[in-house]
Swiss-Prot record:
SUPFAM superfamilies: (Trans)glycosidases. It comes from Solanum lycopersicum (Tomato). The active site is at 211 (proton donor), 328 (nucleophile). Belongs to the glycosyl hydrolase 5 (cellulase A) family. One of its GO terms (biological process) is polysaccharide catabolic process. This is Mannan endo-1,4-beta-mannosidase 2. Residues 1-25 form the signal peptide. It holds the Pfam family Cellulase. Keywords: Glycosidase, Hydrolase, Secreted, Signal. The lineage of its organism: Eukaryota, Viridiplantae, Streptophyta, Embryophyta, Tracheophyta. It comes from the Eukaryota.
C-alpha cells in the first residue's frame, strides 16, 4: 500500500513539474512574441509600431558607447537617456563603431575589446529601461573613431594596393572587414539583457554609414553598388530590424533637375537611386545650413532648409514610397551673432515644418536633433551640444515637439 502511495505521489509531482515547465515555456513564448510585436516596422511610406502609426521626436548622442566603455562614467549615459525620456524623446541615434584609437571597439580587423562591447551592451540596456529606441551606425565616413580611412589602412597593412579612402567601397578586403564588423555587432549577445542584438526590439534600425560620401565617383553609382551589397548582407543576418543608409540627402544623376536643390555641390551620393534599393527601409536627410550656407543670412538659410525638407519629403512619398527622417540638424553656438534665442527660434521653425509634413500621411516620421550631452562633457563640445538640464527653454521646445508628434500619431490619416 505504501508503495502505491509513493508511486501516486511521484506521478503527482511529475505532473506538477510538467505543468510548471509548460507554463514557463508559455511565458517565454509570450515574451518573445511581445518582443517581436515591439519592433518598429515600415508599412508603405510610414512607420508602424504594434500596428499603429509611429511618429517620433528624437536625438543624436554619438558618444554613448565610448563613454560607457568606462564603467565609472556610465552615469552620464543614464543621465542623458533619463532626461531625454522625460522630454518625451523616443529615438536615439548613436555609434556602434570605434575602429582603432582610444577606447576602440575594433582594435584591429576582427579583434574586439570586450570592455567596449560591454559599454554598448549597457547603452542598449539603459535605452530599453527608459523606453528609447536606438538607431545604431556601423562605420563613419570621416576619420573620427577610425572610419573608412582606418579600414583602408588595415587593408594596406594586409598588402592591398589602394589608391585612396574611397576605395573602401570597392576593395574586397575592406568590404570583407566591414561585413565581419556588421556580423559581429548584429549577432552580439548582450551580457546585460541576455538577448542577441538582432532579437532586441530596443534597436529600431541599423545604419550602414554615417554620412557616406565618395569623391571618386560623383554619379552615385559606386555608392549604389556598395549599398546594394551591404544592405543585402545585413538583411541576410537580420530581417527583423529596419535598415537605412545614413545619407545627408544630396541628389545625384538619376534625377538631374533635383541637383539644383543641393547646396552648390555633390558628394558622390544619389538620394533617389540609393534609397530605391529595396532592402533599404527608410530614407534620411541631414541639414546643417550654418555650414553649407555659412555666408548667407539666417532667413536665407531657413528658406533653403524648408525647401530641402519639402523636396525630400515629396520624393520619399511619391518616388521612394518610404518613410523619411531628418536624422541630423542643429544650430551651432559658434555661429557669428549666436544666442540661445536664435537656436530656439530655429528649432521651433524646424519642428513646425516636421509636424506639418508628418500630418500629411506620416511619411515624415520624425527628426533627430544633434546632439544631447550630459553635465560635465565640455570636451565633447562641437558647437551643437545641448544639455537639457541647463537649457530649460530649449528643453521646453523639445518636449512640446515630442508630445505633439506622439499625439499626431493617433490622428494622422494614412
Amino acid at each position: 500500500m505504501a508503495y502505491f502511495q509513493r508511486l501516486i505521489s511521484c506521478i503527482f509531482v511529475l505532473f506538477l513539474l510538467s505543468l510548471a515547465f509548460a507554463c514557463e515555456a508559455r511565458v517565454l513564448l509570450d515574451e518573445n512574441n511581445a518582443n517581436d510585436q515591439g519592433f518598429v516596422r515600415v508599412n508603405g511610406a510610414h512607420f508602424e509600431l504594434n500596428g499603429s502609426p509611429f511618429l517620433f521626436n528624437g536625438f543624436n548622442s554619438y558618444w554613448l558607447m565610448h563613454v560607457a566603455a568606462e564603467p565609472s562614467e556610465r552615469y552620464k549615459v543614464s543621465e542623458v537617456l533619463r532626461e531625454a525620456s522625460s522630454a518625451g524623446l523616443s529615438v536615439c541615434r548613436t555609434w556602434a563603431f570605434s575602429d582603432g584609437g582610444d577606447r576602440a571597439l575594433q582594435i584591429s580587423p576582427g579583434v574586439y575589446d570586450e570592455r567596449v562591447f560591454q559599454g554598448l551592451d549597457f547603452v542598449i540596456s539603459e535605452a530599453k529601461k527608459y523606453g528609447i529606441r536606438l538607431i545604431l551606425s556601423f562605420v563613419n565616413n570621416y576619420n573620427d573613431f577610425g572610419g573608412k580611412a582606418q579600414y583602408v589602412q588595415w587593408a594596406r597593412n594586409a598588402g592591398a594596393q589602394i589608391n585612396g579612402d574611397d576605395d573602401f567601397y570597392t576593395n574586397y578586403i575592406t568590404k570583407n572587414y566591414y561585413k565581419n564588423h556588421i556580423k559581429k555587432v548584429v549577432t552580439r549577445f548582450n551580457t546585460i539583457t541576455g538577448m542577441t542584438y538582432k532579437d532586441d526590439s530596443t534597436i529600431m534600425a541599423w545604419e550602414l554609414m554615417n554620412e557616406p560620401r565618395n569623391q571618386a565617383d560623383y554619379s552615385g553609382n559606386t555608392l549604389n553598388a556598395w549599398v546594394q551589397e551591404m544592405a543585402s548582407f545585413v538583411k541576410s543576418l537580420d530581417n527583423k530590424h529596419l535598415l537605412e543608409i545614413g545619407m545627408e540627402g544630396f541628389y545625384g544623376d538619376s534625377v538631374p533637375e533635383r541637383k539644383s536643390i543641393n547646396p552648390g555641390y555633390q558628394v558622390g551620393t544619389d538620394f533617389i537611386s540609393n534609397h530605391l534599393i529595396k532592402e533599404i527601409d527608410f530614407a534620411t536627410i541631414h541639414a546643417y545650413t550654418d555650414q553649407w550656407l555659412s555666408g548667407q543670412s539666417d532667413d536665407a538659410q531657413m528658406i533653403f532648409m524648408q525647401k530641402w525638407m519639402t523636396s525630400h519629403w515629396q520624393d520619399a512619398k511619391n518616388i521612394l514610397k518610404k518613410p523619411l527622417v531628418l536624422a541630423e540638424f542643429g544650430k551651432s553656438s559658434r555661429d557669428p551673432g549666436y544666442n540661445q534665442n536664435i537656436r530656439d527660434t530655429f528649432m521651433s521653425t524646424i519642428y513646425r515644418n516636421i509636424y506639418s509634413l508628418a500630418k500629411d500621411g506620416g511619411t515624415m516620421g520624425g527628426s533627430l536633433i544633434w546632439q544631447l550631452v550630459a553635465q560635465g562633457m565640455e570636451n565633447y563640445e562641437d558647437g551643437y551640444c545641448i544639455e537639457l538640464g541647463k537649457n530649460p527653454s530649449t528643453a521646453g521646445i523639445i518636449t512640446s515637439q515630442s508630445h505633439a508628434m506622439t499625439a499626431l500619431a493617433h490622428l494622422v490619416k494614412i
